[in-house]
From Swiss-Prot:
Annotated function: Catalyzes the transfer of a dimethylallyl group onto the adenine at position 37 in tRNAs that read codons beginning with uridine, leading to the formation of N6-(dimethylallyl)adenosine (i(6)A).
Gene Ontology molecular function: ATP binding; tRNA dimethylallyltransferase activity
Gene: miaA
Keyword field contains Ribosomal protein: no
Site (Interaction with substrate tRNA): 156
Pfam families for the chain: IPPT
PANTHER family reported for this sequence: TRNA DIMETHYLALLYLTRANSFERASE
Name of protein: tRNA dimethylallyltransferase
Domain of life of the native organism: Bacteria
Positions contributing to ATP binding: 65-72
Cofactor needs: Mg(2+)
Enzyme class: transferase
InterPro entries reported for this sequence: Dimethylallyltransferase, IPT, P-loop_NTPase
EC number: 2.5.1.75
Amino acid sequence: MLACNDDTSLYLLVKQVTKKEIYSNDLENGNVKRGASTHSLYLIGDPKFCRNNSSKQKSIIILCGPTASGKSYLGHELAKAYNGEIINIDSMQVYKEIPIITASPPKSYKTEILYHLYNFLSMTEDFSVIKYLKLATEKIKEITDRGKLPILIGGTGLYINSLVFGYNNIPDISEDLQAQVRNLHVKIGNIELWGKLEKFDPLAASKINQNDTQRLIRAYEVFMQTGKSIFSFQTLPKEQILSDFNCKIIFLNPERKFLYKTCDERLDKIFKEGAIDEIALIKKQFAPKDYTNLKAVGIKEILAYLNGNLTLDEALNAAQIRTRQYAKRQVTWFKNQIQDKITLEYANQEEFTQTLKNSFKTI
């Protein structure tokens, strides 16, 4: 096993098993392409992946990609190989009530590697990207102080963008004000709250859809707390989180046909392995205001099934369609927004898994 610390270069790869050479420009660009004669995945030992031994920077990996692309498996294997610990960067996997519908890492993984910021928060608690970033920063420091490698895994673009490019440090909202605004929202609903926001902060109202409950409440809270538009904070210098780290971003980009297949299979598995009971329990224990705005794909469809508006097959089919649409949007976002990344392309999960295992045998 290879430990990773300030003085250790990371090299992912290792084994080339096709007859076709990987093109030199792919190596230069830090990309991994499939050879013409096979669909195997290659992880390349790119010297750019980490700085050389003279670097004083600590290393960090961000492993991103669409849902159902194999991030959890690859991240777990990397953590085992490079003495790492894993930090969640998925906005829905923070909630402890929905580990099944969000496909959180299995318990077996957590017995081998330390996992952080998964399933720790009640969905009734207020949470924001700023709160996430503060927690993630603390975990990154704790992990590097132990001489280990932080590996951040997820597909939430807002969180990843804020980690990589910095964030606008909006003042904390008091708990009393949060409670007041949420009670107001329950009483008057989205449209009237949006109307109030328009009076106080027309700029925010012009940019926020009336149906976007989370952003609407957030903008109203910020104005009530600060007297300023939430968008005014975007003109200030951004707080940087990873500027002291040698950060490498690995983007998993399966072929679309295969990605859609894995999306469908994941939803089918989730529905069969407890997601229905998970959402039924939430429906029983919590008020609708606590769960109707959760964005995890499948919750809306299962609620429709539980309310008698869809059959189980219809709910599953609707969830699969929405998952494929979400995965497509994620791929587009990562391609366009994150430029400096290592892209891994593959067309078959079995070959991806086997090649990965073969690669780590040679380290």
